[in-house]
């Protein structure tokens, strides 16, 4: 009979588990905050109609960080091509 299973006698290695658990927790919270910020940006954008806003929110919600990146890339490209400044007149007083 073994005194303890193989691997459980290693004293310092649980620290790595706690480190990675904390790291993934912080990454998860950061991704969640980015998704919420993206959804707020979608809701504030005047250039999108209601159906487009709903579709973008669904894309961001179900695809997560990938959906947020896609939205960011496509919205920046569209705002440059249309000359949209998100409702702001730059240079006018």
Curated annotation (Swiss-Prot):
One of its GO terms (cellular component) is plasma membrane. Keywords: Cell membrane, Membrane, Transmembrane, Transmembrane helix. It is found in: Cell membrane. It comes from the Archaea. It is a multi-pass membrane protein. The chain crosses the membrane at residues 17-37, 54-74. InterPro entries: CLS_N. Its main location: membrane. It holds the Pfam family PLDc_N. This is Uncharacterized protein MJ0574. The lineage of its organism: Archaea, Methanobacteriati, Methanobacteriota, Methanomada group, Methanococci.
């Amino acid at each position: 009979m073994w005194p303890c299973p193989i691997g459980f006698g290693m004293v310092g290695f649980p620290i790595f588990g706690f480190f990675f658990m904390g790291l993934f927790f912080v990454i998860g919270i950061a991704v969640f905050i980015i998704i919420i910020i993206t959804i707020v940006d979608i809701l504030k954008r005047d250039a999108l109609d209601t159906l487009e806003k709903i579709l973008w929110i669904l894309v961001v919600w179900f695809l997560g960080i990938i959906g947020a990146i896609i939205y960011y890339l496509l919205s920046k490209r569209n705002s440059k091509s249309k000359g949209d400044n998100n409702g702001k007149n730059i240079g006018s007083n």
